[in-house]
From Swiss-Prot:
Belongs to the alpha-defensin family. This is Corticostatin 1. Microbicidal activity and inhibits corticotropin (ACTH) stimulated corticosterone production. Disulfide bonds join 62-90, 64-79, 69-89. It is found in: Secreted. Residues 1-19 form the signal peptide. The keyword Disulfide bond applies. Residues 20-59 form a propeptide. Keywords: Antibiotic, Antimicrobial, Defensin, Disulfide bond, Secreted, Signal. It comes from Oryctolagus cuniculus (Rabbit). The keyword Signal applies.
């Protein structure tokens, strides 16, 4: 029983350290973004059918999540942290 408690404590400490490291890396990625990179981008394509591609507004608080966005946030693309791909989630307005 003591061994199980000790292993659980070590696992929790490792998970907490990993979460803190991930939080710092996300802050570094957000700080590296260029000023004005959160502006809207519209691309008009010519052809028989009229079409346009609009990149959603990503202003607000964003975070890189491992799998999916919670209900309080919306999907806003992908981000890379140390070569790993994460889902970018931004707060809803």
């Amino acid at each position: 029983m003591r061994t199980l408690i000790l292993l659980a404590a070590i696992l929790l400490a490792a998970l907490q350290a990993q979460a803190e490291l991930f939080s710092v890396n996300v802050d570094e990625v957000l700080d590296q973004q260029q000023p004005g990179s959160d502006q809207d981008l519209v691309i008009h394509l010519t052809g028989e059918e009229s079409s346009a591609l609009q990149v959603p507004d990503t202003k607000g608080i964003c975070a890189c999540r491992r799998r999916f966005c919670p209900n309080s946030e919306r999907f806003s693309g992908y981000c890379r942290v140390n070569g790993a791909r994460y889902v970018r989630c931004c707060s809803r307005r």
